[in-house]
Swiss-Prot record:
<keyword id="KW-0949">S-adenosyl-L-methionine</keyword>
<protein>
    <recommendedName>
        <fullName>Ribosomal RNA small subunit methyltransferase A</fullName>
        <ecNumber>2.1.1.182</ecNumber>
    </recommendedName>
</protein>
<feature type="binding site">
    <location>
        <position position="18"/>
    </location>
    <ligand>
        <name>S-adenosyl-L-methionine</name>
    </ligand>
</feature>
<dbReference type="InterPro" id="IPR001737">
    <property type="entry name" value="KsgA/Erm"/>
</dbReference>
<dbReference type="Pfam" id="PF00398">
    <property type="entry name" value="RrnaAD"/>
</dbReference>
<keyword id="KW-0698">rRNA processing</keyword>
<feature type="binding site">
    <location>
        <position position="43"/>
    </location>
    <ligand>
        <name>S-adenosyl-L-methionine</name>
    </ligand>
</feature>
<dbReference type="GO" id="GO:0052908">
    <property type="term" value="F:16S rRNA (adenine(1518)-N(6)/adenine(1519)-N(6))-dimethyltransferase activity"/>
</dbReference>
<dbReference type="InterPro" id="IPR029063">
    <property type="entry name" value="SAM-dependent_MTases_sf"/>
</dbReference>
<feature type="binding site">
    <location>
        <position position="16"/>
    </location>
    <ligand>
        <name>S-adenosyl-L-methionine</name>
    </ligand>
</feature>
<comment type="similarity">
    <text>Belongs to the class I-like SAM-binding methyltransferase superfamily. rRNA adenine N(6)-methyltransferase family. RsmA subfamily.</text>
</comment>
<feature type="binding site">
    <location>
        <position position="110"/>
    </location>
    <ligand>
        <name>S-adenosyl-L-methionine</name>
    </ligand>
</feature>
<keyword id="KW-0808">Transferase</keyword>
<keyword id="KW-0963">Cytoplasm</keyword>
<dbReference type="InterPro" id="IPR023165">
    <property type="entry name" value="rRNA_Ade_diMease-like_C"/>
</dbReference>
<keyword id="KW-0489">Methyltransferase</keyword>
<feature type="binding site">
    <location>
        <position position="89"/>
    </location>
    <ligand>
        <name>S-adenosyl-L-methionine</name>
    </ligand>
</feature>
Length: 267
């Protein structure tokens, strides 16, 4: 790279730049971008995935927080008519400004691990615009997203992601694929928003509240952890055993608890 455009990864931005050509190719094949599609890449870094995504002929918008990377990306992709760069924080990005039809946007990114969970929740609030998402994340985070009830990985992230999306843990990526190498293993996840929610809640914000309350003290029984929102009778009325711990409940049970709370608030 031209010395004028050299850039060191910044710890405060959680930057680890992907450089393994084999992994890059595998990710691009999983995304399977095509001409006529609209993609959004979050945190393009030095453009490892960007090059291949643009080569598909798809329209590509990228959001990059690091101001020092902006001239590097602008210089590298200046001749690409299907490239548009937004400098800013993806956590504050308004996806509606892209003007895409419902269920059409493909979102991709090697997400900074220090903001990956809040960023996923921000994206879920725009799930109606999104066709699919492919992310590089900390392996542990992907395992939590894809977890099922009954284990230690099942929690707020699993439930809220699976409420909105089908989750596929595609493959793992070792530290050597990055510069500098992170201290943890990574993984690629595919999230596909449901066309029809399998367990629609009356109020998804109440579902988030119920799930957060339940897992604040995950080792306690529901009867104890939920007492600020629902008493024992209300839990039973939702068809849920109050003596269970939160990790023993599936998504459908949490939706029933949230709906019980919604009914209680309207009474």
């Amino acid at each position: 790279m031209n010395e004028q455009y050299q850039h060191r990864a910044r710890k405060r931005f959680g930057q680890n730049f992907l450089h393994d050509a084999g992994i890059i190719d595998r990710i691009l094949r999983a995304i399977n971008a095509k001409a006529g599609e609209h993609l959004l890449e979050i945190g393009p870094g030095q453009g490892a995935l960007t090059e291949g995504l643009l080569g598909s002929g798809a329209q590509l918008d990228v959001v990059e927080l690091d101001k020092d990377l902006v001239p590097i990306l602008q210089h590298k992709f200046a001749d690409r008519s299907n490239f548009r760069l937004h400098q800013g924080d993806a956590l504050k990005f308004d996806f509606n400004q892209l003007g895409v039809p419902p269920r059409s946007l493909k979102v991709v990114g090697n997400l900074p691990y220090n903001i990956s969970t809040p960023l996923i929740f921000h994206l879920l609030s725009h799930a109606g615009l999104i066709r699919d998402m492919h992310f590089m994340l900390q392996k542990e985070v992907v395992e939590r997203m894809a977890a099922g009830p009954g284990g230690g990985d099942w929690g707020r992230l699993s439930i809220m992601v699976q409420y909105h999306c089908r989750v596929e843990h595609l493959f793992n990526v070792g530290p050597g694929a990055f510069n500098p190498p992170p201290k943890v293993d990574s993984a690629i996840v595919r999230l596909v928003p449901h066309e029809v929610l399998p367990f629609p809640a009356k109020d998804h914000l109440l579902l988030e509240r119920v799930v957060r309350e339940a897992f604040n003290q995950r080792r306690k029984t529901l009867r104890n952890t939920m007492k600020g929102l629902l008493d024992s009778a209300a839990i039973e009325a939702a068809g849920v055993d109050g003596s269970l711990r939160p990790e023993q409940l599936d998504l459908a049970a949490f939706v029933r608890l949230a709906d019980q709370l919604a009914d209680q608030q309207q009474a």
